[in-house]
């Protein structure tokens, strides 16, 4: 990135080929005999020191004063989930740890997901997480239909807000899952000629106005879904130096920043109310129930159960739906056993 010296433009901008050509032309207009290749040769040499703005910010913070600021920031979001402050604290440490490059093997694949009515300042809260000096590394404008740009954003931005999460289509959910857990970026830079491996900095946060938005039961552990019960208090001043100094101090003293099995269980259980249920799942317990102790019931394959539902409510019957229905039965914890004709499940007709 570059910035003009003695200019009123205080922000740094990407140094792409267009910028290099402009610098060369401006220099020639001033009577300096040089070409764009001369500038490129200088820029991409050891004459220009490597600069990481995130690390520059993090490693020039004051000492932490010992007062917790991460959990109180989470508590400005009115919600009924008692685990929210601790989960947000863990996610925040994870975000900072990946800015520092502490974990190159795994990405920060967990994302808070704030669900609430319009006007509750969800997006304002997400934006307030970034310190003002690093605000250019925050974005809420990501088009998942442009996959190359999304992948490059993992290197370009430090925090990405998936605004209007419910607008991510079902066909894009698989790509979103891939992006959330992708630890590095393998792509060709703009105007580049070869594929290079680039470091991932980005963590994710998301917002939505609608509650039934999780379509993949196995993927719910990647989200910290929170129903915002009122307007988020974004009027409190945030001491960014101490907020991030706390994260740096805790990471330096071995505080766990990754989510363990217990955390994932808490998230999965809390996310049930945000799950979007398929028609098959909604009708299953209208026509069947689980067998009680000592009750034999019927042992049926997913296709047999789905055929009965098809006769009752005209649910489409095909191989893809049968495979998905088997996952639904397992998720519901319905007793199963393996037979010669495949896995069968124990149910009683209601």
Task: Give residue ranges: language-model regions.
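DNA transaction DNA-binding modules
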Residues: 258-350
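AAA+/SF3 P-loop NTPase mechanochemical coupling elements
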Residues: 150-155, 189-207
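N-terminal nucleic-acid engagement/recognition segments and initiation subdomains in replication
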Residues: 1-68, 72, 79-86, 315-316
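P-loop NTPase catalytic core of nucleic-acid-dependent motor ATPases
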Residues: 45-155
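Conserved AAA+/SF3 P-loop NTPase catalytic/coupling segment centered on the Walker-B
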Residues: 157-180, 214-220
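A short helix-turn-beta junction within AAA+ P-loop NTPase domains corresponding to the substrate/partner-engaging
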Residues: 214-232
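Long, low-complexity, charged/polar intrinsically disordered regions in eukaryotic proteins
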Residues: 236-271
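Conserved catalytic/switch belt of AAA+ P-loop NTPases
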Residues: 173-196
């Amino acid at each position: 990135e570059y910035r003009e010296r003695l200019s009123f433009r205080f922000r740094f901008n990407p140094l792409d080929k267009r910028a290099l050509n402009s610098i060369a032309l401006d220099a020639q207009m001033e009577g300096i005999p040089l070409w764009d290749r001369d500038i490129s040769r200088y820029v991409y040499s050891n004459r220009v020191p490597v600069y990481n703005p995130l690390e520059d910010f993090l490693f020039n913070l004051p000492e932490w004063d010992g007062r917790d600021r991460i959990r109180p920031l989470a508590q400005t979001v009115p919600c009924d989930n008692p685990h929210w402050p601790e989960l947000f604290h863990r996610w925040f440490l994870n975000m900072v740890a990946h800015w520092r490059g502490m974990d190159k093997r795994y990405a920060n694949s967990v994302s808070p997901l704030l669900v609430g009515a319009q006007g509750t300042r969800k997006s304002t809260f997400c934006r307030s997480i970034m310190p003002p000096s690093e605000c250019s590394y925050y974005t809420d404008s990501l088009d998942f239909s442009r996959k190359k740009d999304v992948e490059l954003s993992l290197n370009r931005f430090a925090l990405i807000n998936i605004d209007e999460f419910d607008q991510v289509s079902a066909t894009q959910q698989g790509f979103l899952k891939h992006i959330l857990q992708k630890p590095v970026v393998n792509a060709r830079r703009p105007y580049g000629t070869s594929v290079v491996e680039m470091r991932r900095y980005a963590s994710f946060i998301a917002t939505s106005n609608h509650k039934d938005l999780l379509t993949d039961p196995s993927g719910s552990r990647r989200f910290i879904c929170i129903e915002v019960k009122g307007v988020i208090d974004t009027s409190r001043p945030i001491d960014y130096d101490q907020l991030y100094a706390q994260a740096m101090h805790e990471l330096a003293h071995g505080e766990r920043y990754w989510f363990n099995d217990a955390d994932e269980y808490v998230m999965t259980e809390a996310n049930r109310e945000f799950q979007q249920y398929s028609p098959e799942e909604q009708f299953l317990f209208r026509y069947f129930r689980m067998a009680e102790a000592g009750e034999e019931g019927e042992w049926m394959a997913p296709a047999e159960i789905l055929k009965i539902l098809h006769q009752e409510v005209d649910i489409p019957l095909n191989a893809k739906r049968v495979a998905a229905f088997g996952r639904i039965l397992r998720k519901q914890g319905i007793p199963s056993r393996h037979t010669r004709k495949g896995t069968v499940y124990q149910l009683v007709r209601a």
